[in-house]
């Protein structure tokens, strides 16, 4: 009964996120990223830390923190060409930590991952960067993995409401790409364009992904417009923005709906104070200057993505187990 209520709440949150994204996708994204994003990073990292980041050994998470530190160094010294390799190594290295207990096997696995990563970084740099620097920390994190968490919950409970939640999640996502952009009410000001500038490449690359599937209208848009026109004013650019805004908004709301997971009442006063102070400063910086807010929260944003990798892997393993269990019955 409690699980059904949670699923129902999440269905309502999906529909609400979609409804707002249809009309004001740019404003919605910028708002939730600045206001809900920092609180999400802080509370999720706090929750993951209490569960040892779902790793098998007590100090395994130092591996992830080491690569978070390297990513910070690449950002400070303008060495972002190494970012995809570092994220790739952290992603598959986290998987190796879950699978191997032996220190020797872990070391050999890490060497193998680094070698493969360096080869991909050298010979397939464009696509390698696209996947591991752009899509994995953004749309894969907020949409694909959120969808997998919903699927795992539905498989575990086998409830009709759980199945309904995954159907609604997919339906909302598809609907946002199909509903006419003529009803868009976003006010595209110079300030909005400037605030969104750092995210613009995500929209462009996602449009290119859809172009790969040979949508004639998208091909025409890409060929005949500049980047700002494509992202902020074209029909499919607006539809892609709706999808991104929905994915991020629901990702955050889904997390905050899990009050039994966050357990505010069990969090120490000092931790709560630290969380709210950092959150308040972050929102204030975003309000003052959006780009300053992004720079301030870069480390926290990328850290929460990387620290969730073991949980992402564990969820995929659990989904496989659930499917295998149910098909064998």
Regions found by a protein language model. Give the residues of each.
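Membrane-interface helix-boundary motifs at transmembrane edges
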Residues: 2, 47-58, 99-109, 151-164, ...
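Hydrophobic core of alpha-helical transmembrane segments in multi-pass integral membrane proteins
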Residues: 11-20, 62-77, 88-99, 110-123, ...
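Membrane-interface helix-loop-helix junctions at boundaries between adjacent transmembrane segments
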Residues: 75-163
